[in-house]
Amino acid sequence: MKILLLGEYSNVHATLAKGLRCLGHECIVASNGDFWKQYGRDIDLERKHGALGTLEFLTKLLRHLPQMRGYDIVQLINPIFLELKAEHLIYIYNYLKRHNKRIVLGAFGIDYYWVKVNTDIRPLRYSDFNIGDYIRTDEIAECIRRDWLNTPKETLCKHIAGTSDWIVAGLQEYWATYNEVVDLRKKMSFIPFPIEMAKDPTKDKTANNKIRIFIGISKSRSVYKGTDIMLKAAEDIVAQYPEKAELIVASGVPYEKYHKMVESSDLILDQLYSYTPAMNALMAMSKGIVNVGGGEEENYQIIHETELRPIINVLPTYESCYTELEHIVLHPEKLAELKRQSVEYIHRHHDYIKVAKQYEQLYLSLL
């Protein structure tokens, strides 16, 4: 097959492309590299700031658009798959729809349905937009609602979701959300995110008998993602048990340094309001780092995992984070098994070749 993967989130498309190429398919990734992360791509669609950057981007886009014709499959990372306004993107989408055989939409991140369903219907016990029946009103959540509800982004998302040939959800939460939309559930499936396994994942990183706890801080999204709560719990644990634990905090560091800091740790704190580990945590788990975050039973059920339980699941409260961290700090002998299970979990369910085979089956079924 001839496949175009358009857009990028956290290395999903770049990793999937590697797997599809290993299976013998022609696969092109066109993206901006996910902004500052600069993931690999075949066609660079990065948009730089300023009028000159806009002109350069539009020139690149017009030059590459004719190369985006004649594919068996075009997969979009999100309804906002290029750095363009929604009212302009709709014309690019319609062009792709006309000149390629099948369009697949990724439910991999924030879009209209993720915002609307989790604000109004609330199928999840907690999410980026609700905790039970309580609607979250932190600044970022409200900003995202204003961005996606009753705007051109809503129109674009509905149009692409309604006219695409299939929708793939990459996390259980996205699957549960889209499953609430009656007109879309008949053309939707779940496929896990692809991860390229680490070469030396089980190396013991514990230093001086201290458990090393890592947390990455994005100040603008700290409250929205629950990092503020996780950070406070971790700080209090280290203050209470300074001889047993140490905290590694990454904030505003270059991406390469960020990953080195992750790799030096034993635990990673990530995504308090999630049921499942996303790409950051999954990549850490592949290296034998234990994820403290989303590990609800729904996560294991959707992948039919009945044995492994590598994730230290926490509820979206300070008390839950503190209790779970304290337990592992006081029982460090449990770490080795959790690390082993973390690597096995990724191998079973997220290995990029296995995931690529699932996409291959889906794509072939659409042709």
Q: What feature does the model see in each segment?
A:
Residues 189-225, 231:
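Conserved donor-binding/catalytic core segment of Leloir-type glycosyltransferases
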